[in-house]
Amino acid sequence: MKPVLQGALAWIYAGYKTASRGHLLPYTRHQKFHSSSLISEQAKRAKDLIKLVNSSSLSNSESQSLDWRSDLKVPEWKRQKLALKDKFKGQQWNPKKKLSREQMENVRLLKRHFPETSATELSERFQVSPEVIRRILKSKWQPNEEEQLQLQTRWKRRSERVNEILGSPEHQKLPPKKLVLGSGRTDTDLQVKSVRRTAVKAGRNSSSPKGKQKLNLLSKLIS
């Protein structure tokens, strides 16, 4: 283990001792060396050190005890943090995925044609929990004619908005092309290397003298 990492971990784990007067006094040099040697024995890699730090943290010890629920001295922000940690059981934030109606119908269709398929296999396919698949298969709700008409009307409005956005002149206008010409050291003829599309900047005057000279040169080369 590197000396710098040992020193940093020794500083983390050494902590402070509370004196009788209420002041905080650091540990002695012997205690720091002893704590760093214990850390190097318990954790050999950086991942093990991170796990060791998290397991010995104050919030972890507080979450394991049930006194924080009845302790009025615990601040509200820490109470919410411990409650979320208890709810998710240490897992990272992973919001549930919501399936659309078409995907729900696909789940029912797959289960109807392949009855031997389990809920776990379907959940892996649709990237949801098996409980979601069980609820979908258990549900017998079907939209009536009025609800189906409302759904179709809503999807029609969405498609019209998408077509309006894609059909606007800004999306239909293609950027102008730019010819990249080049020749070898021994060749006398110019060759087109590539054709690039360049976006025209706003407020740029295309009828400038420099642009006209380039167009005249290009027309002579092509002819």
From Swiss-Prot:
Mitochondrion keyword on record: yes
Protein name: Required for respiratory growth protein 9, mitochondrial
GO cellular component term, pick one: nucleus
Region (Disordered), start-end ranges: 166-223
Pfam family, one: Neugrin
Similarity remark: Belongs to the RRG9 family.
Subcellular location: Mitochondrion
Keyword annotations: Mitochondrion, Transit peptide
Functional description taken from the UniProt entry: Required for respiratory activity and maintenance and expression of the mitochondrial genome.
Main location group: mitochondrion
